[in-house]
């Protein structure tokens, strides 16, 4: 069952794994008081160190809330379940394990060492079943050897690995079908952009707080110094602009003025277009009203002409009837004389 050790550069988690973990968490929450659940991740390796996590299954797990060093994971159940999964899909192998965190725990290193019996390059994916903020609910880690500066023996620690959500075509169709009924149609592209920017700022704020806490703990000698982290922080600080430089301030003013000019011109164009539309609507309404009045006058003229024609026709018919009556009387008088 163990496979050759491969470096991990990125972890792709499929929606089926997220649904299975949430279902596992909800089921265990109803029957017990466990704060987190543990399971095994199945998947395969892609090219260039990309791990594709496509399936998972739950494993019986329990731990002491007071003493985190006391825990139990049923590895016999793990082996039996993996054997059955292997019969269904031989391509999927044990690639790591998961728990619902939401943070790293003290006994995660020991649990990871147990899972490494089945997968030497085991990956830990923390899946937050109850996320408080928007964003990805997954955090991936791999175990590495940490070398101490004081010459003490090396120790195991976790190193963060980039993770993302990926899906195949069939999974995308299923997820769209599930989200179709709960999709908010009132949310537009503008609100989505604002929400994404807001979540990005919240994430940046959280990362800055973590950096501050780490530096404070290192400064207070509560945590050992990690030179790799310090070098990365130094690179970040080197990328920050010097706001005290007059040239930088002037450049920012020029850029801000250019952006405000674009906004001003866009507002003027929108106002002019709205004014033209208003004028066009008024002209159209006026033409429509004039057309209605002209049609009414034409109808009245037609009605008067018809009435006049009818009256003239009736007068002519009346005259003809009178002439016939007079002619009949004359012929009757002549006959009586004879």
UniProtKB/Swiss-Prot annotation:
Alphabetical list of Gene3D superfamilies matching this protein: Cytidine Deaminase, domain 2
One Pfam family, short name: JAB
Chain segments carrying region Disordered: 286-338
Keyword terms of this UniProt record: Proteasome
A single cellular component GO annotation: proteasome complex
InterPro entries xref list: EIF3F/CSN6-like_C, JAMM/MPN+_dom, MPN, MPN_RPN7_8
A single GO BP: proteasome-mediated ubiquitin-dependent protein catabolic process
Limits of the MPN domain: 11-147
Family according to the record: Belongs to the peptidase M67A family.
Function: Acts as a regulatory subunit of the 26S proteasome which is involved in the ATP-dependent degradation of ubiquitinated proteins.
Protein name: 26S proteasome non-ATPase regulatory subunit 7
């Amino acid at each position: 069952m163990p496979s050759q050790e491969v470096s991990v550069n990125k972890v792709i988690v499929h929606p089926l794994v997220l649904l299975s973990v949430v279902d596992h968490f909800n089921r265990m929450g109803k029957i017990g008081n466990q704060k987190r659940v543990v399971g095994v991740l199945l998947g395969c390796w892609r090219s260039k160190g990309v791990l594709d996590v496509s399936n998972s299954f739950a494993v019986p797990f329990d731990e002491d809330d007071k003493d985190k060093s006391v825990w139990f994971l049923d590895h016999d159940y793990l082996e039996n379940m993996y054997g059955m999964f292997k019969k269904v899909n031989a391509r999927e192998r044990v690639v790591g394990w998961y728990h619902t965190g939401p943070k790293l725990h003290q006994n995660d290193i020991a649990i990871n060492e147990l899972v490494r019996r089945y997968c030497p390059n085991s990956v830990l994916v923390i899946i937050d079943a109850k996320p408080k903020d928007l964003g990805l609910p997954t955090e991936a880690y791999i175990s590495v050897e940490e070398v101490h500066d004081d010459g003490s023996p090396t120790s195991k620690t976790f190193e963060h690995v980039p993770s993302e959500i990926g899906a195949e075509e069939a999974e995308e169709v299923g997820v769209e079908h599930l989200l179709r009924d709960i999709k908010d149609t009132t949310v537009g592209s503008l609100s989505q952009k604002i929400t994404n920017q807001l979540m990005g700022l919240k994430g940046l704020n959280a990362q800055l707080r973590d950096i501050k806490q780490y530096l404070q703990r290192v400064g207070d000698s509560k945590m050992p110094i990690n030179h790799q982290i310090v070098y990365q922080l130094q690179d970040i600080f080197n990328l920050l602009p010097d706001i005290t430089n007059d040239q930088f301030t002037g450049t920012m003013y020029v850029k801000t003025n250019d952006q405000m000019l674009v906004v001003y011109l866009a507002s003027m164009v929108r106002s002019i277009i709205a004014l033209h539309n208003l004028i066009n609507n008024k002209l159209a309404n006026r033409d429509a009203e004039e057309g209605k009045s002209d049609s009414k006058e034409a109808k009245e003229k037609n009605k008067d002409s018809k009435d006049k024609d009818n009256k003239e026709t009736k007068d002519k018919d009346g005259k003809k009837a009178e002439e016939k009556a007079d002619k009949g009387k004359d012929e009757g008088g002549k006959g009586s004389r004879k």
